[in-house]
Amino acid sequence: IISVKNYQLQSAIDDIKNLVHKNTIILPLLNGIVAKDILQDAFKDNQVLYGLAIKIDAVKIGNKITQTNSAIIQFGDANNKEMSEGVLAVKNLLNDAKINNQVFEDMIKTVWTKWMLNIGLNQVSAISAATYGVIKNTPELLTLVDKAMKEVMNVSQVCDINLGDRNWQSVQDVISTL
């Protein structure tokens, strides 16, 4: 599992290069849409899965971190209509460790859908200094969130990912729970 910030990815690759063997399966849990490709370029002979974590709602106040939900790792190959041996091995490992996980048939759309949510909420939160709760209850900020997410949907069309209404609605469902 690679779980670092995107700007730390190259350093993490350098750190693990001598630890990765021919049967190592790599599972990145970074936000965004490029980590899998970067890792696959670095480890050409290894299976690198798509991955992300959701329902991470940790809040830090002072020196205390509170997590109220159980996070879920979503992962898999690009297409998981039939799970590969590697995906099944990782699923069994996570299940044995009692780590919540899901494998979706189309992991590329799953990663892009989370990226759409992050682009919408995180960017608007950064420029407005508003919490997600404030954003949810401020129509002007929600309009900005929607515009940012629509831009991701447009980019997805150009990249032949084709996020659609179902992806949009799943993100709206998440926003409504904030």
Predicted regions: what is each one?
Residues 19, 42-47, 62-166:
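Internal alpha-helical scaffold of NAD(P)-dependent oxidoreductase catalytic cores
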Residues 57, 110-111, 172-173:
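Short secondary-structure capping/turn micro-motifs that flank functional sites
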